[in-house]
Structure formats: structure tokens, C-alpha cells
Amino acid sequence: MLKKIQFEQIRQGMYVKELCASWMSSPFWQKSFLVEDAATIEKIQKAGIREAWIDTAKGVDVLEPEIQAAPEPIAPIKEVVVETPKQVVAPVPYSQVVQVSMDAELGRAAKIVGTSKTAVFSMFSEARMGNAIEAEHAMPLVEEIASSVMRNPGALIGLARLKTADDYTYMHSVAVCALMIALSRQLGLSDEEVREAGLAGLLHDIGKMAVPPEILNKPGRLTEEEFTSVKEHPGAGYEMLLEAKGVGKIALDVCLHHHEKVDGSGYPKGLNGEQISLYAKMGAVCDVYDAITSNRPYKAGWCPAESLKKMAEWSKGHFDDRVFQAFIRSIGIYPVGTLVKLHSGRLGVVVEQQVGKSLLLPKVRAFFSTKSMAYIPPVLLDLSGPGIQDKIVSREDASTWDLKDINRYWLGDAVDSV
């Protein structure tokens, strides 16, 4: 029987069906779990959760109060039985989400990235232990990421790129989720398709939890045998998602086929061209972009613009051209965080792409003079603005100019949250 109880009544051995809290504020990945020890109760307390639903058929019931000699009997604790599902509030249509500046979104995006990392780590840990995941509870996280991307795609996508090598497996999933959402919007997909594509991005690499950690995190080149083990992750993930709750066809498809290539040289099935779905083609582009822009145990990431150049060179055999071109439009020719050289001789970092304006004319924060070879007071330039004569002449490598920590020029106050 389901029963709603107060925090003070929670005890070891109870089976919690659901905490009375939003999924984002819950300290647990799984909605339902057994209270195994005092540490579990302490986590609930620290999260500030005051009520929970328990299932007395799967765990112990509340303690009945000891009845002392008293003039009046003690009333039994009232039981509340769930008879109807809770009403779900429909999310705001993405077309109605108000777009904001990079500065306005960075703080919110940083919090979402932090929460996402914890949630994905918990979800993937459950998968590594062989437990079935409840993927439908990831949808509120997808909604948070989607809302941020709709407000300003550069903020969360840029922040997710700044993962460490140790965080890669988990933050890669968050980044691909955000990239899939931005690409879905660019392709004109419906809100529901955008959500499903985002969920697919979040779950696409769940199968890597079946790969031994020493192979997954190996700093050197993989042996042929080790690479064969890694190549099994799409199939392993597909099997995991078949057992999960709330996973639709799109997530299953992307999980299994995001390493397929349009020329048939991909894996696991060697599909080509139209044998590969739109969503799997999207997953392939987003997966590769985040992989090559991220620091890995065995290599440093490339800058965003350099990564797009490399992908363009590979695109004929690897990617669907229509999808790849839409991807470029979704993040810009010079994505946020790209170091560029201006016609004036100044170096700057791209801080924002502007909706409805030329991809060649983003906002840039100039901070270094190549003429005097010295740092200059940072100045924000809207290259699309009236009277602005400066323009981008090249993308640059920070190491060429011995520049350190250029990300601070676009992160601003959010740098402390990364």
C-alpha cells in the first residue's frame, strides 16, 4: 500500500516510492529506492525534503505509536492511498521562450551544468552496477537544458565544452544533449522531437558503462583488442535502454547508430546514406564535435572553429551534408570561445552568436594587440553593429601567441562556477 509520511517517520528498511520533491532537487537518481542505512536518511534531510510516499508492500511500515495508559486512545496515523496520477504541467512551448544575452544566461547555465553532471554521474553509475535506469526521470533535466539552449545556445554549450578529462564521460552526454537540442531547433523539428532528440543525446553513450574503466580512461593509444571492446558500447547501450523505462525509439536509434557514417564505414552495422535515420545522423555530428573539442585522457581538445574545419574535411564520407550545414548554423562558423584575429591586428574571443545576423559577424571581446605584442584593456565589439569597420580575418591558436586561459574573456562572472 502506498502511504504518504513525514520525514520524521522515515526509517531504515522502508521502500520509498517517491520523494515529495522535484527531480532536480532530489539527492537520488532513482525515483524509488530502499532506505538501507542512516546515511540515506541523512541525504534526505540535507536536501530539505519533508514528505515522501512509501510502499509498505516492499518495505517496513511506519512505527505505530506506543500506547501508554491514557484517558483517551491515540488516533492511528492517517493513511493516504494514491488513486489518480499527479497532474503534469505542460512545458512552455519553445517558440515562446524569451531569448536573452550571453551575460544574462551564463549564471543559470552554469547551475544547470553542475546539476546535470551530478545527475548523469548517478544515472551512469546505476547502469555500471547493472541496475535498470528510469530514463523518464531524465526528462526534467532535458527540459532544463533545452530551456537554457532556447534562451541562449552559446552559454550552456560553451560551458559544457570546458569539461576536464576526468569528467569527460558524463559531461560529454550533457554537451551532446545540448547540441542535439540546438541542431533540432535549427532543423525545424517539433517541440516533442526536440525533447526526444535531447534525451537521445543524454543517453547515447550509456553503453560505455559496459566498457572496463581502465580501457575507457586509458591515456595512451588503445590496442586493437581494446578498441574492439570500445566499439561494443552502442550495442551494449541499446540493450540497457531496452530495459529502461521511458525510452522511445529515437533514443534507442541514436544510441545504436551514432557511430555509423554515410559512406558505410561506421559501426556497428556499417549502414550508409539513407539507411541511417535523421536522428542518428544528428547524433554522429554532435558526438564528434564535442569529442574533438574536449580534453581527453590521451589528447587536448581542438578549438571550436578548428574542429568545424576538420569536420568539414571529413564530412563527405562521415556526415550527412544537410545535417552538418545545419549544425554549423546552430553554433556558428566561429563558435563561442573561438580565438580570432581581427583586421585591426587585435586578438579576441568570440563571446556570442547573434540570432538573425551574419555568422561571420559575432560579438568579440578583444584583449590583445599583435602589433605591440601586449595585452590591452578588454573591449566588447559587436561586429554587426553600425559603424564597426573591424572584421575577423582568421581563427587563431592560443598557444601560437602564448596566451593563457582565454576562456575567462567570454565566461565573465560565471568563471567561478566552472
Predicted regions and their residues:
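Membrane-cytosol interface segments
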Residues: 1-133, 389-418
